[in-house]
Design a protein with these regions (language model features):
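Short, ordered loop/turn segments at secondary-structure junctions
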Residues: 38-40, 129, 240, 323, ...
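C-terminal accessory/binding modules appended to enzymatic or scaffolding proteins
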Residues: 13-14, 311-313, 476-510, 628-666, ...
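A glycine-rich phosphate-binding loop feature that marks nucleotide/adenosyl-phosphate handling sites
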Residues: 178-185, 321-325, 379-384, 403-410, ...
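Long, charge-rich intrinsically disordered scaffolds of nucleic-acid metabolism proteins
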Residues: 97, 401, 407, 412-482, ...
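Low-complexity, acidic/Ser/Thr- and charged residue-rich accessory regions of DNA metabolism proteins
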Residues: 142-151, 209-210, 243-276, 280, ...
Length: 712
């Protein structure tokens, strides 16, 4: 592990001892949120991203180490493992370089070169490569026997062997990689006959596309690969100057001007076209796809983070409405804890148009269930339903919000929803989800597969294993950042708490059901299978608002309770007094409480938590209204200024909901009056913005917007 620590430290430019401490904690079962929050002295204050990078790099090095063992044993079984080769492999920590070393020894399917070797033509190939023989014809005749028909057959077989050797030579491959790295071009052409198909229209921009690979953005590359997988596009990668590649390869291998050298030249041309170029193209296609995947996953994870940390309404009585025309609007009433109290359908819109009856029902329900806020899904009939709801007069002040429906239909048909509401259909479950999303987006969204939430960029085209790992880590990070009320949280929310997982989460819910609410964090140790390690990892992130010890409703870890108690004792007060009285806290000298294991970083965190125990890091929610005059694409005009909500962020800009079916695009160049390289630096998911309509493409239903000069 020490060697890995040194290597990771050099790569990430961090002190090796901090890397070693972090790896030790990770291998000891500590989670990333726990290490970041409660082990700052050991890590030197590394954040979750840095700890995640260390973990990822360590896992890659472990994989590479296992691969080296496989390579060594395979070559040893062949009897070809020399001390020099063993030393090279042992010292190699680059995956590409390792595969290059292994390539000549790698078991292959039957190749042309293998067939030529079987005919006994390897000595002839060696003779050609030496390029010293002046009487080649006489030498070649010696190989015309058995399966070798004539001199040309012998030379062809020898060239096949040379072509394979050249293509597997590390120098050849590195030369080609350098050429691709500097000047590779990615090109796409429409597959003949596909240009007129309606399904191909979305790829029109790529029917005749060409640009340097290093300039091809992740979203373009993923679009190209999707078009290729759908059979619409033919995508190729090649070096801009192929003649230069051939010239450089000739300098490496052609050392004379005789008949042997001419055969080597011919073999080299074949090696380039048939073996080397396709191999490096495949390598760069995979590398560029991997980079595009990483970028798309990063964008998705950041968008998901913003969505999960969206402002909550909090514990208020809410009416949730899943709007619709033909099937009507499904209405549910929830109490402040999100429990379903009532459900029914109303039809204020065509075709039934029972406006007056629907209005009476909504007004009556608001009064009957003391509704404080109404959440309306942003799908079909959303604008009409919003206008209908805001047009009524209620007996109290009622806030109206439009809530994203993305993933609600998937949740409503899921096993989770069936378990929660076995006696209700999908429409009721969907409306409940919409209402609960307003109350606490994080608690509700964790029940839905993150890929269904709709804030990704080509999420179905990227590496699904990496995507899931990244999104799970993002959800875990958000849940632990906010903290969880152990007495009200669902098992889905508890699953993401540091150190728990599905089994312990279910055990906590079962224990709570059988024994009533938890009264202290220590009581968690009575939960079946809750060991000391799991308790250490989860306790600081679980909150108990009604606990006798106020620290149980804070982010102060139980291991630090003695420190806080000592602080209170030194000031002749209780812990509760210390939390309530800012003046008392100002008298605390943190240096007095520094020990070998607890330093100023942890003590500073404790003091900040005492200032606002259990504080919610999420922002306050704001009411938003769309422009009442804009309902469809036909209502838009160039130059219009409109309010909107950011629904998705990509590398090339952001999409904004302006109250109609189609979202508008604000290109990255139109986000601000200054240069913007990363849209996420300027906007966030669900941000309220003002935009101006630049252009409308009615045929493709695309809207170009700008935020320039609008004081966002």
């Amino acid at each position: 592990m020490e060697k890995f620590s040194q290597m990771i430290a050099a790569e990430l430019k961090l002190p090796a001892h901090r890397i070693a401490n972090t790896l030790k904690l990770l291998q000891g079962g500590a989670t990333i949120p726990f290490i970041s929050r409660y082990r700052k002295e050991a890590t030197g204050g590394l954040d979750e991203v840095q700890i995640g990078d260390i973990q990822t790099r360590y896992e890659k090095l472990c994989e590479l180490s296992k691969r080296k063992e496989t390579v060594l044993s395979t070559i040893e079984e062949q009897g070809k493992l020399t001390p020099e080769l063993k030393s090279r492999i042992s010292a190699c920590w680059n995956a590409t370089e390792l595969e290059d070393i292994y390539l000549p020894f790698k078991p292959k399917r039957k190749t042309r070169a293998e067939a030529a070797r079987a005919k006994g033509l390897e000595p002839l190939a060696l003779l050609l490569m030496m390029q010293k023989e002046n009487n080649l014809a006489a030498k070649v005749r010696n190989f015309v026997k058995g399966e070798v028909k004539d001199e040309e057959d012998a030379l062809k077989g020898a060239r096949d062997i040379l072509a394979e050797q050249i293509s597997e030579d590390e120098r050849s491959r590195n030369l080609m990689r350098n050429q691709f790295q500097r000047q590779a071009i990615i090109q796409s052409k429409v597959v003949k006959g596909k240009e007129t198909e309606e399904a191909s229209a979305k790829y029109r921009d790529y029917f005749d596309f060409c640009e340097p690979l290093k300039k091809c953005s992740s979203h373009r590359l993923l679009a190209l690969r999707r078009g290729e997988s759908e059979g619409v596009l033919k995508v190729t990668i090649f070096p801009e100057d192929e003649d230069m590649c051939n010239e450089r390869l000739q300098r490496l291998f052609v050392r004379a001007n005789n008949a042997c050298a001419h055969q080597v030249e011919e073999a080299l041309t074949d090696a380039y076209k048939r073996l080397l170029k396709p191999a490096i193209e495949t390598e760069f296609a995979a590398l560029s796809k991997e980079k595009a995947d990483e970028e798309a996953i990063r964008v998705f994870a950041e968008n998901l983070r913003q969505l999960l940390l969206a402002p909550p309404l909090g514990q208020k009585r809410v009416m949730g409405i899943d709007p619709g025309f033909r099937t009507g609007c499904k209405v549910v009433c929830l109490d402040a804890q999100g429990t379903l109290l009532h459900n029914e359908a109303i039809s204020p819109h065509p075709p039934k148009s029972e406006y007056a009856q629907a209005a009476r029902k909504v007004v009556k329900l608001v009064e009957q269930y003391k509704i404080e806020a109404i959440a309306i899904g942003n799908g079909t009939a959303s604008r009409e339903t919003e206008q209908f709801v805001t047009s009524q007069r209620y007996d109290r002040e009622v806030q109206v919000f439009v809530v994203s429906e993305d993933g609600a239909s998937i949740y409503s048909a899921s096993k989770t929803a069936r378990e929660e509401f076995p006696d209700y259909d999908v429409t009721v479950r969907g409306a409940v989800s919409i209402g609960r999303r307003l109350m606490d987006p994080l608690a509700e969204l964790v029940k839905i597969d993150a890929k269904s939430i709709g804030v990704g960029q080509y999420q179905h085209d990227v590496d699904q294993t990496k995507l899931k790992a990244s999104l799970d880590q993002t959800v875990e990070s958000c849940v632990n950042l906010v903290g969880v009320n152990v007495n009200t949280a669902s098992k889905h929310l508890l699953t993401y708490v540091s150190g728990l997982g599905p089994t312990l989460a279910q055990n906590i819910v079962d224990y709570r059901t059988e024994n009533g609410p938890f009264e202290s964090r220590r009581q968690l140790l009575k939960v079946p299978r809750m060991g000391a390690k799991a308790y250490e990892q989860c306790a600081g992130f679980l909150r108990i608002p009604q606990a006798k010890n106020p620290l149980d409703n804070s982010a102060v870890h139980p291991e630090s309770y003695p420190i806080v108690e000592q602080m209170a004792k030194d000031l002749n007060c209780t812990v509760a007094d210390l939390i309530k009285d800012k003046e008392l806290r100002s008298k605390i000298d943190l240096k007095k409480y520094v020990t070998d294991t607890v330093g100023l970083p942890t003590l500073t965190d404790i003091l900040q938590e005492l200032d606002k125990p259990g504080r919610d890091p999420r922002q306050k929610i704001q009411v938003f209204e769309f422009d009442k005059n804009v309902r469809t694409l036909d209502d838009l005009q160039e130059g219009m200024e409109l309010p909107g909500i950011v629904t998705n962020i990509t590398n090339f800009g952001c999409f904004v909901d302006i109250g109609i079916k189609e979202n508008g695009l604000v290109h990255v160049s139109q986000l601000a009056d200054r240069f913007v390289s990363n849209p996420a630096d300027v906007v966030r998911i669900h941000q309220h913005v003002r935009v101006k309509v630049m252009s409308i493409d009615h045929e493709r239903k695309r809207i170009q917007l700008t935020m320039k000069g609008l004081n966002n």
